[in-house]
Every structure is written in C-alpha cells, then in structure tokens.
C-alpha cells in the first residue's frame, strides 16, 4: 500500500497540482498586496479615505456604536461585514482576471508553436489511391 501511495504521489499530475497550489498561494499574497497597498489607497483618495473593509452593520444588539469592525467583533457583536466581503470579491476578480490573461498568453504561445511545427513539417507525399492499387492488382492478375 505504501508503494502504491509513492507511485500515486510521483505521478506528474499530482506534482503539477502541488506546484500549482504553492504558486497560487504566493500569487494570492501578491494580488492581496496589490489591492490593499496600491489600489485601495487610490480608491480611498477619491472617496475621502473610506476604508471599505471596515464597513459593517451590527445585527441586533443594544444599539452600541462601534468604531471599527475589529472592535465590534472583539465585543462579541453579531456583524454583517459587507465591506470585507466586497473587498474579497474584488480580490477574487483581480486574481481571476490575471489568471485569465496568463492562460490566454500560454494558449497563444502553444498555438504559435503548433503552427510553426506544422509549417516546418513537409507534407507527406500522397501515396497511391485506392483506385491505383486496385488497377495494379488487376493488371498483375491479367499477366
């Protein structure tokens, strides 16, 4: 059973998936930094410094106003954190767009390589048609 597991792990697909997950995690950190450190400050500049991740609504409760989402959560209030959700969706859309562009570039490169390969291969000479072969057989049988 251990040998089967080693064989399974050593297969290319499993290794490719592991590398993809590791690179994906690192890529997610880069995109999160892009959004948090570069895009959000620019958006904040146009919206008067509003931090969207801090937008929330307290559900129920005693009417206490909290200064931040962290303070509300720390106090144990039930919150609807719509700002954090919207920022997560925004991060996802940026990641999806970048991945789409990468896949598109890879597909174009593969298509270009396939076209070059097809152009480099000379066309195989056409062999005799079925009719030609049958005529040859007929002629040999006549002799």
From Swiss-Prot:
It holds the Pfam family MscL. It is a multi-pass membrane protein. Disulfide bonds: none annotated. It comes from Ruegeria pomeroyi (strain ATCC 700808 / DSM 15171 / DSS-3). The chain crosses the membrane at residues 14-34, 83-103. Gene3D superfamilies: Large-conductance mechanosensitive channel, MscL, domain 1. Homopentamer. It is found in: Cell inner membrane. GO terms for molecular function: mechanosensitive monoatomic ion channel activity. PROSITE patterns: MSCL. This is Large-conductance mechanosensitive channel. Channel that opens in response to stretch forces in the membrane lipid bilayer. May participate in the regulation of osmotic pressure changes within the cell. GO terms for cellular component: plasma membrane. Keywords: Cell inner membrane, Cell membrane, Ion channel, Ion transport, Membrane, Transmembrane, Transmembrane helix, Transport. Belongs to the MscL family.
């Amino acid at each position: 059973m251990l040998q089967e597991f080693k064989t399974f792990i050593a297969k290319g697909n499993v290794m490719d998936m592991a590398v993809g997950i590791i690179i994906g995690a690192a890529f997610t950190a880069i995109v999160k930094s892009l959004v948090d450190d570069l895009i959000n400050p620019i958006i904040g500049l146009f919206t008067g410094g509003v931090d969207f991740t801090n937008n929330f609504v307290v559900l129920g409760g005693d009417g206490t106003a909290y200064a931040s989402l962290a303070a509300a959560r720390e106090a144990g209030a039930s919150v609807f954190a719509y700002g954090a959700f919207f920022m997560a969706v925004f991060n996802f859309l940026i990641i999806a767009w970048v991945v789409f562009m990468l896949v598109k570039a890879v597909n174009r490169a593969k298509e270009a390589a396939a076209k070059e390969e097809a152009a480099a291969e000379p066309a195989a000479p056409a062999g005799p048609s079925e009719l030609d072969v049958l005529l040859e057989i007929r002629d040999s049988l006549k002799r």
